[in-house]
Amino acid sequence: SSAASDVYKRQIDDERFAHAYAHDKLTYDKWGRRKIEQGLYQKGVSKDIYGKVLDEISDERYIEVLKPLLSKKWKTIKGRNDYECAMKLMKYALGRGFELSVIRKCIDDMEIPTDD
């Protein structure tokens, strides 16, 4: 087998791995694009492969994962007021690798109970 076909085979393997990794981390571990990107980088997957894989994650699917995660976390967050709780929620989601713009959109869409 030639060196060129070995390189091609490795790229196909890396692509398949990157797809499976991204799918599993988003679905089961509730990771955002940034954290998935970091993981793929650490595993030695090339930027053009993981860039393409991350671009294929639809925003709908992404929000579908993030909203329930934020709703569940909201119930356990303690803070002096809703603003402080929302900031903690944002920090939590950023730590899981989600982007600020998506987090903000999800928080804005959430029915956040106020302490009346």
Regions found by a protein language model. Give the residues of each.
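An alpha-helical, amphipathic repeat domain used for nucleic-acid recognition
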Residues: 5, 9-116
